């Protein structure tokens, strides 16, 4: 149990997708203007990562990995070269289902996220989470915890940035730094803050 708690805390704080690896920056910067929208997108990313990382773990372990098809009578087949294509396809299918669900049951959030909901499909934070899972050879349980933790870490970062940007609207910022300029500086300072977790031993 302690191992899973450690993995969760590590994926949220020490190896934060947005502030340690700078993954998913497109939507991270574009949808962080309002806290309500940022929370909505953050929840969507958590749900997608919690589903796609474990599903891609099963896909890798039982179909793509070298010797994975032994259960089907093909022990010598290695389909790992199809990994990237397969992972993106599974992520795209999951996002499409989530988009249809939100359109049907939560139309206000669907309209607020707008074009950025389909962009979750190509959000490199989600693909990065899947690739890290494969590279680190996580089992199914670890991939579930890692998917939830990595998604929660990204959601935490975008919500915090949105809160700061809402406060910055009322600040006297020099004209050349307004907009993305001060946002990049803010993200850099946030990432420095998260670097302090790097020395933690869990």
From Swiss-Prot:
Which reaction(s) are listed as its catalytic activity? a ubiquinone + n Na(+)(in) + NADH + H(+) = a ubiquinol + n Na(+)(out) + NAD(+)
EC number of this enzyme: 7.2.1.1
* Major enzyme class: translocase
Q: Which InterPro entries does the entry link to?
A: NqrDE/RnfAE, NqrDE/RnfAE_oxidrdctase, NqrE
Gene Ontology CC, one term: plasma membrane
Keywords (A to Z) from UniProt: Cell inner membrane, Cell membrane, Ion transport, Membrane, NAD, Sodium, Sodium transport, Translocase, Transmembrane, Transmembrane helix, Transport, Ubiquinone
* Membrane topology designation: Multi-pass membrane protein
- Name a biological process GO annotation: respiratory electron transport chain
User: Where does it reside?
Assistant: Cell inner membrane
Its main subcellular localisation, reduced to a broad class, is: membrane
The record's annotation in Pfam families points to: Rnf-Nqr (PF02508)
Transmembrane parts of this sequence: 5-25, 35-55, 81-101, 114-134, 144-164, 180-200
Q: Which GO terms describe its molecular function?
A: oxidoreductase activity, acting on NAD(P)H, quinone or similar compound as acceptor
HAMAP family in the record: NqrE
**What family is reported?**
Belongs to the NqrDE/RnfAE family.
Q: What subunit structure does UniProt give?
A: Composed of six subunits; NqrA, NqrB, NqrC, NqrD, NqrE and NqrF.
Q: What does this protein do?
A: NQR complex catalyzes the reduction of ubiquinone-1 to ubiquinol by two successive reactions, coupled with the transport of Na(+) ions from the cytoplasm to the periplasm. NqrA to NqrE are probably involved in the second step, the conversion of ubisemiquinone to ubiquinol.
Name of the protein: Na(+)-translocating NADH-quinone reductase subunit E
- Which source organism does the UniProt entry give? Psychrobacter arcticus (strain DSM 17307 / VKM B-2377 / 273-4)
């Amino acid at each position: 149990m302690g191992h899973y708690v450690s993995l969760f805390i590590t994926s949220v704080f020490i190896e934060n997708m947005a502030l340690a690896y700078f993954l998913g920056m497109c939507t991270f910067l574009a949808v962080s203007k309002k806290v309500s929208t940022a929370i909505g997108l953050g929840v969507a990313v958590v749900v997608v990562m919690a589903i796609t990382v474990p599903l891609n773990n099963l896909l890798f372990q039982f179909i793509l990995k070298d010797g994975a098809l032994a259960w089907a009578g093909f022990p010598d087949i290695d389909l790992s070269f199809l990994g990237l294509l397969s992972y993106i396809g599974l992520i795209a299918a999951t996002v499409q289902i989530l988009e249809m669900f939100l359109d049907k049951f939560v139309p206000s959030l669907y309209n607020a996220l707008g074009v950025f909901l389909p962009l979750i499909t190509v959000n490199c934070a989600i693909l990065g989470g899947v690739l890290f899972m494969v590279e680190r050879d996580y089992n199914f349980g670890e991939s579930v915890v890692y998917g939830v933790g990595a998604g929660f870490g990204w959601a935490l970062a975008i919500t915090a940035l949105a809160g700061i940007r809402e406060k910055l609207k009322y600040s006297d910022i020099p004209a050349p730094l307004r907009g993305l300029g001060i946002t990049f500086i803010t993200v850099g300072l946030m990432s420095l803050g998260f670097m302090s977790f790097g020395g933690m031993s869990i």
